Every structure is written in C-alpha cells, then in structure tokens.
C-alpha cells in the first residue's frame, strides 16, 4: 500500500495488513499518485511549481525510492493562479490509465513517460476560451471570480473508464 502525504511531501508504504514498511521524503508538492507497476509510480503536481519540481508529472522509481524523471512542464503563468484539487485525477481499467483535471476539456492516456490526448469533450459555447488562461491572475479566487461571470463548463470532476465505456461528471 502506497500513501501520498501531500502536507509532509512523503510517500508512506504499508503492507496489506497495515504494518508500516517505509517512508520516503519527495521534497516537492504532489497532489496525486498513480501506481503503474511495482517499480513505477507517477506523482501529479497540478500547476504547483516547487523548488525541486517543474513538471505536472514526476516519475518515481518505487524500487530505488527516487525520482527518475518528469514530463509535461508546468505553465509559469498557470502556476501563479490555477491551483485546484480533485479527489483523484486518474482512472485505470486493465492496462489503460486515464488522466483528467478541472478546467480542461481533454482526457489523456497516461503512460509512465508521457501524457497523450485521448478524448476531447466538446462543450460548445460553454467551453472556456484559451484566452482566459493567458490572462494574469493574482490567485485562484481572482480567476474563479472571472469564470463565474460566464456559463462555462469547468471540466471533469470524476471519471471511471471501463472496457467499452466511460462514466464521468463535469461542472
């Protein structure tokens, strides 16, 4: 069992009976974790740039208990204001891992080294124009106040993928 402690910036490991096994400091902000296999996990940092981390996704080697890389650079502009958390940002069915996030109309296939667009949700006139993400906001509240002046779909809040189907909800 792997537990991401966001506040302490640690990964805790327990056996399936709840006995503590190990603790590893990761020294950067991460809000989500997806276990790919026994040797690899992906840590998700959203748009939060840390001193030691500037990627949305960090590849973590579970065997060596160390970071082995990262991908999908965080936008400097979005790092100033776009900090939102979902309960989860991942869904797995079989060997397929999907990734999604708020304020995004795309569902991605996630591999241990890449994030590839898989599905696009056409929200039509309710889609957030890209120009909204290019403005300079001081914080998430300023951004959200601007969004609330419109009737936009804010993105996917939960997602489950199955063999021949996807179940999702969005705002």
Residues of each region from the PLM?
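Conserved beta-propeller blade signature
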Residues: 1-3, 41-43, 96-98, 166-167
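Asp-box/WD-like beta-propeller blade repeats and closely related beta-sheet repeat scaffolds
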Residues: 4-56, 66-79
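Short, flexible beta-strand-to-coil junctions
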Residues: 6-7, 45-49, 100-105, 169-171
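Repeated scaffold domains used in trafficking and secretory/extracellular systems
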Residues: 28-36, 79-89, 153-158
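Residue-level detector of Asp-centered blade-edge/turn motifs that repeat once per structural unit
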Residues: 36-38, 92-94, 161-163
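Loop-centered beta-sheet repeat module
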Residues: 55-114
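Flexible internal linker/loop segments at domain or repeat junctions
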Residues: 122-153
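Loop/turn-rich, solvent-exposed surfaces of beta-rich toroidal or solenoidal domains
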Residues: 146-171
């Amino acid at each position: 069992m792997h537990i991401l402690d966001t506040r302490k910036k640690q990964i805790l490991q327990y056996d399936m009976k709840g006995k503590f096994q190990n603790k590893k400091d990761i020294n950067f902000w991460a809000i989500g974790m997806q276990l790919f296999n026994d040797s690899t996990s992906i840590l998700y940092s959203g748009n939060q740039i840390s001193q030691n981390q500037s990627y949305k996704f960090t590849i973590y080697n579970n065997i060596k208990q160390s970071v082995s890389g990262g991908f999908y650079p965080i936008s400097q502009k979005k790092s100033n204001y776009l900090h939102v958390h979902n309960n989860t940002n991942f869904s797995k069915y079989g060997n397929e891992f999907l990734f999604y996030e708020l304020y995004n109309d795309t569902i991605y296939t996630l591999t241990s080294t890449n994030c590839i667009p898989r599905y696009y949700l056409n929200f039509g006139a309710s889609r957030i124009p890209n120009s909204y993400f290019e403005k300079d906001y001081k914080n998430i509240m300023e951004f959200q106040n601007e969004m609330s002046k419109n009737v936009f779909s804010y993105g996917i809040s939960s997602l489950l993928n199955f063999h021949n189907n996807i179940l999702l909800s969005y705002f």
